[in-house]
């Protein structure tokens, strides 16, 4: 990997698009020709088409039997001024069977000047005159935010949250240990992380959150980040109308009931019909639909069935006074022909924004999935419901959905299923979509009249619904293939210019615990090619992008928390990832996160995997910067693993188990149980299995509260010694300076 420059960044060039506005005013003497006019009076309408822009075809309404129509309809196009843009105007006659073209004209937009507004006449068939009003202006307010900095809403949240945490930490730690908390500048930024792992991760994280809530640790956290299964629990918790007034204890009881049912009950004919009809509505509006949409509906029906209309934006009310940690969710953008271990862009989701920090491009959550061009929305859709995002965040399970439901007839269970998920790559779930162009630009000119169009759409819907129903209720190719299972959305970076530049990196002077040389970077954790192509850019010409479960690259959401602008001091991570056995080393995902961080020049403590050989399996491990005076920006990590150790002997910290029943309920294995009750592919948890896993992680967390408190005290001291402790100051990020490109292109000696 010696060819990789660790300071390489891909940024979006600041650029401007043009907004071209057309008002179709009127037409006079519309004719079908002498013979045609004898048979019928025209029913005219106008189609506008610019091939170089998305959402390229527009049309007016039609008037029955009117040769002098007055439309006064306004249409807007977003244009790239660097392309040749030609407006094609087609005068149409609406007919019952198929509409008729009455004439076509073109107008080259390069003749328009910015700020100009004019009326332009067009003549058809030497008789008909049509008047269009045209204007051109610069799009000065794009819908994407181009910046590496945090959004203003998150900055405001952080300031409010620090005020709350200051008082909460004093209460938690006591006056002596919190004596260093003089102001909000002394408040450390604490982040809590949950891994993927299906319902095992979700149930385990529910126990964790109960313990953190009861102990007061949650009140001291700024961020809560989840991946796949943990993100499902976070979605369930934050979308609950009674949270945070009602704590996880009550909400977890509802969750236990919801996951006790057979998932096949979700596939009753009535429910399937409702799912598919809802998806048809999305498809017919012009949005891509994949199996991940269906999976999201099933997850939603299981976990948030009484609030299926909830959106990510609506979760703002849970943090509007900084009363809870800011929830962060994630997925990956992947390429069809590249393993996600080699290339993946991390996409982050919060109630405030969705975007990719790699490129510094962010949008409001309600715009995710809308059609963009050059940073401006050209077609806005309704905000995707939260359950759609839950399907995307955990989409690895839609790949082997037949295994989840047990409809394939396969008898393989347990570790075999884990291994199968382990071997999935993005190439298995992302089809190479050859039909990337807009459907609308491929349509023939004209449409049928409203009645015929309605009949045509109804036939299409019936056919599509029938195919989807048959695929869902039978062991069809849809279950047996992994192709095309990824989530798919319109590419919000379509048409942008990406510039590979080499900044005077704000990270370059940071001293990490151990600088990685080429040999260390080449050391594989899971795959010889891991992260080989992470510096490659997204394809800004592709009209749609594929988004998949982040666990397909590594199973902990560290990239969200390691964003330099967030300046996190203490990370408490909970790893529910599958292991070959209960006695296997638990650091694979953490080592991948470390390697990713080092390759991106982000501070990260050295993870010593040999601590497992020296100390054996423990409930949690602490990894610190060895020299905090030098490694001023390196966070401390407390890493909890899924292990049943002290829980077998104690029903609460310091309270031994005494009765036979108490001992039997705690005597279980996680990964060595031949019945595999905690398999990643288990989507039904009987009450006993739920309670065992929930109570285990509740105990493990409470049993190590002092470890967390001590780390908080140390983090306060680090803050006092280094008042500006933050990986990158927000002002520096916005003021980045770049090397001269000509200098960079000079040959090296």
UniProtKB/Swiss-Prot annotation:
Coiled coil: none
Domain notes: The N-terminal C2 domain associates with lipid membranes upon calcium binding. It modulates enzyme activity by presenting the active site to its substrate in response to elevations of cytosolic calcium. In the presence of phosphoinositides, regulates phospholipase A2 and lysophospholipase activities in a calcium-independent way.
Modified residues (Phosphoserine): 2, 434-435, 437, 505, 515, 727, 729
Quaternary data: Interacts with KAT5.
UniProt note on regulation of activity: Activated by cytosolic calcium, which is necessary for binding to membrane lipids. Activated by phosphorylation in response to mitogenic stimuli.
Xref: Pfam families: C2 (PF00168), PLA2_B (PF01735)
The encoding gene: PLA2G4A
Region (Phospholipid binding): 1-178
GO annotation, biological process: arachidonate metabolic process; glycerol metabolic process; glycerophospholipid catabolic process; leukotriene biosynthetic process; monoacylglycerol biosynthetic process; phosphatidylcholine catabolic process; phosphatidylglycerol catabolic process; prostaglandin biosynthetic process
Protein name per UniProt: Cytosolic phospholipase A2
Annotated binding of Ca(2+) 1, by residue: 40-41, 43, 65
Binding positions for Ca(2+) 2 per the UniProt entry: 40, 43, 93-95
């Amino acid at each position: 990997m010696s060819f990789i420059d660790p300071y390489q960044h891909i940024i979006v060039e600041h650029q401007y698009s043009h907004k071209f506005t057309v008002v179709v005013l009127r037409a006079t003497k519309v004719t079908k020709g002498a013979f045609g006019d004898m048979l019928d009076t025209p029913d005219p309408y106008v189609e506008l088409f610019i091939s170089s822009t998305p959402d390229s075809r527009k049309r007016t309404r039609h008037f029955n039997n009117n040769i002098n129509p007055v439309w006064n309809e306004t249409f807007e196009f977003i244009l790239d001024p660097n392309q040749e843009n030609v407006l094609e105007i087609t005068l149409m006659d609406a007919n019952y069977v198929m509409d008729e073209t009455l004439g076509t004209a073109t107008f080259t937009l390069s003749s328009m000047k910015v700020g100009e507004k004019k009326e332009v006449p067009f003549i058809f068939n030497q008789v008909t005159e049509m008047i269009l009003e045209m204007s051109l202006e610069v799009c000065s307010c794009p819908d994407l935010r181009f910046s590496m900095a945090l959004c203003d809403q998150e900055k405001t949240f952080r300031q409010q949250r620090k005020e709350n945490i200051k008082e909460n930490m004093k209460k938690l730690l006591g006056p002596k240990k919190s004596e260093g908390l003089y102001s909000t500048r002394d408040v450390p930024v604490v982040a809590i992380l949950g891994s993927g792992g299906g319902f095992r991760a979700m149930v385990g994280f529910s126990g964790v959150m109960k313990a953190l809530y009861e102990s007061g640790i949650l009140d001291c956290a700024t961020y809560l980040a989840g991946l796949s299964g943990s993100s499902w629990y976070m979605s369930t918790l934050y979308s609950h109308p009674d949270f945070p007034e009602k704590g996880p204890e009550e909400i977890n009881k509802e969750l236990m009931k919801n996951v006790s049912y057979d998932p096949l009950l979700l596939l009753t004919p009535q429910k399937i019909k409702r799912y598919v009809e809802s998806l048809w509505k999305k498809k017919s509006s012009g949005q891509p639909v994949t199996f991940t949409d269906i999976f999201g509906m099933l997850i939603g029906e299981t976990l948030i069935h009484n609030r299926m209309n909830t959106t990510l934006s609506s979760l703002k009310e849970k943090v509007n006074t900084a009363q809870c940690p800011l929830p962060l969710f994630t997925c990956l953008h992947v390429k069809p022909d590249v393993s996600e271990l080699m290339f993946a862009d991390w996409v982050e989701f919060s109630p405030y924004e969705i975007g990719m920090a790699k490129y510094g491009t962010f949008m409001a959550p309600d715009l995710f999935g809308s059609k963009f061009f050059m940073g401006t929305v050209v077609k806005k859709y309704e905000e995707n419901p939260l359950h759609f995002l839950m399907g995307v965040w955990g989409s690895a399970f839609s790949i082997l959905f037949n295994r989840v439901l047990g409809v394939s007839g396969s008898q393989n269970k347990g570790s075999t299923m884990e291994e199968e998920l382990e071997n999935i790559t993005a190439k298995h779930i992302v089809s190479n979509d050859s039909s990337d162009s807009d459907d609308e630009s491929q349509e023939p000119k004209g449409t049928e009249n409203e009645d015929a169009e309605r009949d045509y759409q109804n036939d299409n819907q019936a056919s599509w619904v029938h195919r989807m129903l048959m695929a869902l209720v039978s062991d069809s190719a849809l279950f047996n293939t992994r192709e095309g299972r990824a989530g798919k959305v319109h590419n919000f970076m379509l048409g942008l210019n990406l510039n590979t530049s080499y900044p005077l990196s704000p990270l370059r002077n940071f001293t990490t615990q151990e600088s990685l040389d080429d040999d260390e970077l080449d050391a594989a954790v899971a795959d010889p090619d891991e992260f080989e192509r992470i510096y490659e850019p997204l394809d800004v010409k592709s009209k749609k992008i594929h988004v998949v479960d982040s666990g397909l690259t590594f199973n902990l959401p560290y990239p969200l928390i390691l964003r330099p602008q967030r300046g996190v001091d203490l990370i408490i991570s909970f790893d529910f990832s599958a292991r070959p056995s209960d006695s296997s080393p638990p650091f694979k995902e953490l080592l991948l996160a470390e390697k990713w961080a080092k390759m991106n020049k982000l501070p990260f403590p050295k993870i010593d995997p040999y601590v497992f050989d020296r100390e054996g399996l423990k409930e949690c491990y602490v990894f610190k910067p060895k020299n905090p005076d030098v490694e001023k920006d390196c966070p401390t990590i407390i890493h909890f693993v899924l292990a049943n150790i002290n829980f077998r002997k104690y029903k609460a910290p310091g309270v031994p188990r005494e009765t036979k029943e108490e001992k039997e309920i705690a005597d279980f294995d996680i990964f060595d149980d031949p019945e595999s009750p905690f398999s990643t592919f288990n989507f039904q948890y009987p009450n006993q299995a739920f309670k065992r896993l929930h109570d285990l992680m509740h105990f493990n967390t409470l049993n190590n509260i002092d470890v967390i408190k001590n780390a908080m005290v140390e983090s306060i001291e680090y803050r006092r010694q280094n008042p500006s402790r933050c990986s990158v100051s927000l002002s520096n990020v916005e003021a980045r300076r770049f090397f001269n490109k000509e200098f960079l292109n000079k040959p090296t000696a």
